[in-house]
Regions:
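Metallo-beta-lactamase
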Residues: 28-84, 89-95
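Acidic-enriched, low-complexity/disordered segments with a strong bias for Aspartate over Glutamate
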Residues: 9, 18, 40, 56, ...
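Core dinuclear metal-dependent hydrolase active-site scaffold
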Residues: 1-52, 66, 115-122
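Binuclear metal-ion centers of metallo-dependent hydrolases, dominated by the metallo-beta-lactamase
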Residues: 1-2, 49, 73-122
Length: 122
């Protein structure tokens, strides 16, 4: 973890994720913004290490199955990180492996559900 790749003005940093050996989260720095993508991960207090990156936005898995945090665990992590924008992900992928994203976005400051095939600007 902590490996960094720079591509032009974009910096990508691999961060801890509790899933498989190969799994990692991702910090993306671009245009003076810092984004955190949890990737597949179970709840683990090591996720709070993300605080040092001071992300402006989090993209956190919420489906609670197959090695991923559930909504309440995702809320705990996102609230501790304290980003201005918090976006649930990893839901509605499979009928038997989903969660209502509103359970996340309605219970955190800056909660936001992205629409499919839409572009967003931070």
């Amino acid at each position: 973890m902590g490996e960094t790749l720079k591509i032009g003005d974009i910096t990508l940093t691999a961060v801890f994720a509790d899933h498989t050996v190969e799994a990692f989260g991702l910090i993306v720095n671009a245009e003076n913004k810092t984004l955190y993508f949890s990737g597949d991960t179970l709840f683990n207090e090591r996720l709070f290490e993300i605080l040092e990156y001071k992300p402006d936005a989090t993209f956190i898995c919420i489906n609670g199955r197959l090695g991923n945090m559930n909504v309440n665990e995702a809320l705990t992590v996102a609230k501790k990180i304290g980003a201005k924008t918090n976006i649930p992900n990893h839901y509605d992928m499979f009928a038997s492996n989903s969660e209502d994203p509103r359970l996340f976005s309605d219970n955190i400051d800056g909660g936001f559900i992205m629409e499919f095939n839409e572009e967003y600007e931070f």
